[in-house]
């Protein structure tokens, strides 16, 4: 409830846009540490007195600076309110370090407390009510539980909904959840200290002496990260590579795969047009 209250308080504020976000990601156990270089811009038609960013409430800000100067800010849950006015068209570079554990309670604030905590409640896709305020649900036969993020030595899964990186867009529109809003940001991600594990994210992957990095030729609306002991099978069609990651020993699906590599390439080419 407190996260909804905090978000509604600043819902009508004009927002900045994050043009670029360069991140260096590390983790130890269930704790993560991120150093982020951001470029903010005010594209609105008026000055913004207190630019707002959003970050998972379980992640504490170690430092927040701009061009070597500490910036004052207030924080209410996942809402970070900076005490620094931005004029129309102004760009503001930020250097932010944050660390901690992921608080999954920030995910899917549009769900009622009953739906969020009911482990037998499943959300029906594409079935929002006519007003767009709440998704419809069904009662499942089995109790599947609900996890929206995981950070650990064996496996890590971080989706945009858990606010594992700084965003200028709130995680959900509480008035009308079906209305999605995104920033298109130039993301660059470097993951350190995960030797021997598969590191999966959006973009072009490169290995270096520190770890694995991902860069993108075009701005993206959001970013995910998955780390774990995965095996991979790939096929290349017209210089475009397709890959499947799976748990070790779980390649049973390959035995029933009767298409040759050449036939599979033709099938993919036909689908791509």
Identify what each model region corresponds to:
Residues 40-44:
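Asparagine-centered strand-capping/turn motif at beta-strand->loop junctions
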Residues 98-223:
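Extended, low-hydrophobicity, Ser/Thr/Pro/Gly-biased non-transmembrane segments
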Residues 47-48, 58-125:
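A surface-exposed beta-strand-loop module
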Residues 33-35:
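Short, solvent-exposed loop/turn segments enriched in Ser/Thr/Gly
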Residues 1-31, 145, 179:
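N-terminal, polar/Ser/Thr-rich
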Residues 18-25, 77-82, 171-176:
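Short structured motifs
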Residues 90-92, 217-230:
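C-terminal beta-strand-rich structural cap/linker in extracellular carbohydrate-active enzymes
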Residues 81, 189, 213-215, 231-273:
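Juxtacatalytic substrate-recognition/specificity segment
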């Amino acid at each position: 409830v407190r996260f909804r209250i905090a978000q509604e308080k600043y819902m009508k504020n004009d927002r900045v846009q994050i043009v670029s976000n360069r991140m260096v990601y590390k983790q130890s156990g269930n704790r993560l540490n991120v150093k982020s270089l951001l470029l903010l811009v005010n594209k609105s038609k008026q000055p913004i007195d207190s630019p707002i960013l959003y970050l998972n409430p379980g992640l504490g800000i170690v430092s927040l600076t701009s061009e070597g100067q500490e910036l004052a800010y207030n924080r209410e849950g996942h809402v970070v309110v900076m005490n620094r006015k931005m004029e129309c068209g102004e760009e503001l570079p930020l250097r932010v370090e944050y660390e901690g554990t992921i608080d999954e309670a920030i995910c899917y604030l549009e769900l009622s407390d009953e739906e969020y905590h009911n482990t037998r409640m499943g959300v029906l896709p594409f079935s929002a009510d006519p007003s767009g305020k709440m998704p419809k649900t069904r009662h499942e036969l089995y109790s599947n539980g609900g996890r929206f993020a995981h950070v650990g030595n064996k496996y890590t899964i971080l989706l945009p909904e858990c606010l594992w990186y700084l965003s200028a867009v709130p995680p959900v529109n509480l008035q009308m959840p079906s209305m999605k809003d995104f920033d298109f940001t130039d993301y660059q991600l470097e993951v350190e200290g995960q030797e021997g594990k598969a590191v999966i994210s959006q973009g072009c992957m490169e290995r270096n002496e520190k770890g694995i990095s991902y860069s993108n030729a075009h701005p993206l609306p959001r970013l995910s990260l998955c780390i774990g002991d995965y095996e991979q099978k790939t096929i290349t069609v017209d210089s475009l590579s397709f890959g499947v990651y799976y748990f070790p020993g779980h390649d049973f699906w390959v035995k029933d795969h009767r298409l040759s590599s050449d036939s599979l390439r033709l099938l993919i080419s036909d689908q791509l047009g």
